Regions:
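Short consensus segments that form the blades of beta-propeller domains
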Residues: 89-92, 147-153, 207, 250
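Blade-loop segments of beta-propeller domains
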Residues: 64, 72-73, 98-157, 170-179
Length: 301
């Protein structure tokens, strides 16, 4: 990790007007700061500041510190109307909030605010959220504190869904033991893709990658059920393991990394496009196969 975090969020302005394509920088940070209950955290802080509390200026170990600025690295971004949601997974100590937002009308380096509010500390670690056609924010909470040499599964991995019109938590669904084939599986649940239209809000499906143990978890909102799918095309390519960076060779074995959907056809079926992170190929499968537990899918390269 570099000394400074720098991430740019880009808005394509030509979507709003008939003009030549031009990319504008919406936000840029060197390091992240937070505002929680009106308190600004822009430097390392041992304790969370609370009204009328008494504090002693004693040093504490990193695993007890409330905020360690250098450790806060953003992972996922999603936009809904004037809000940009930013996730900070707990891969190090000192992460005050894993799900946050800023306003599009903010300055170029706004402070993050916990979503939906400062009481969201029941969320452990989120990567890449998604907003669906029904105005809902979906995410997978891995439940895992992923600090090297201190990995701790604080709670079972779960799907969380928020109503963005009311900012209420609509659903928290814990994944089943059969969805997770080893203790490594929770750390691989880094993305969720929602299959729904504005006319079928109660019949949504979600497709979750598991890059760590190379599978896919499918969730049905109507059935409130989930199931795991295994296939060779979800696995890393053993001929593409080695990456050379700055003259150093790194071996990587991540499997299924992301899933994208086509527009639905006249029957409501989509194509799901996906790939393992370590692979030279892109694959497709129809969502009808994914929605039917136990059915053998036909995957195409």
């Amino acid at each position: 990790m570099t000394c400074f975090i720098k991430i740019l969020f880009i808005v394509l302005c030509c979507q709003l007007c008939a003009c030549k394509p031009k990319l504008n920088t919406a936000f840029a940070w060197k390091q992240l700061s937070y505002e929680i209950d009106g308190v600004l955290y822009n430097k390392d802080t041992n304790l969370r500041v609370r009204p009328n509390a008494i504090y002693f200026d004693n040093d504490v170990p990193d695993d007890e510190k409330f905020f360690i600025q250098y450790n806060n690295v953003p992972s996922g971004v999603e936009v809904y109307k004037d809000r940009v949601f930013v996730t900070v997974p707990r891969r190090r100590f000192g992460i005050p909030s894993t799900l946050n937002y800023v306003r599009l009308s903010s300055d170029k380096a706004p402070v993050l605010k916990p979503y939906p509010d400062s009481r969201n500390d029941q969320l452990v670690s989120l990567y890449r959220p998604r907003v669906d056609a029904c105005g809902r924010l979906w995410a997978v909470d891995t439940g895992l504190l992923e600090v090297p040499d201190a990995r701790t599964q604080l709670q079972k991995p779960s799907i969380v869904v928020f109503d963005l019109k009311t900012d209420r938590l609509l659903l928290k669904y814990e994944l089943k033991d059969s969805d997770l084939i080893s203790e490594r599986s929770p750390g691989g649940l880094t993305s969720i893709t929602v299959d729904v239209t504005a006319n079928t809000c109660d019949d949504a499906y979600a497709y979750i990658n598991d890059l760590a143990t190379e599978g896919m978890v499918v969730f049905s909102l109507r059935k409130l059920d989930s199931w795991r799918i295994e296939h060779e095309t979800f696995k890393h390519d053993p001929t593409a393991l080695n990456f050379t960076v700055g003259g150093n060779v790194i071996t990587w074995r991540d499997g299924l990394f992301s899933i994208s959907l086509s527009e639905p056809d006249q029957h409501g079926t989509r194509l799901a496009y996906y790939h393992p992170m370590v692979s030279l190929n892109e694959y497709t499968v129809t969502t009808d196969f994914l929605k039917t537990p136990g059915r053998t899918p036909t995957f195409k390269i």
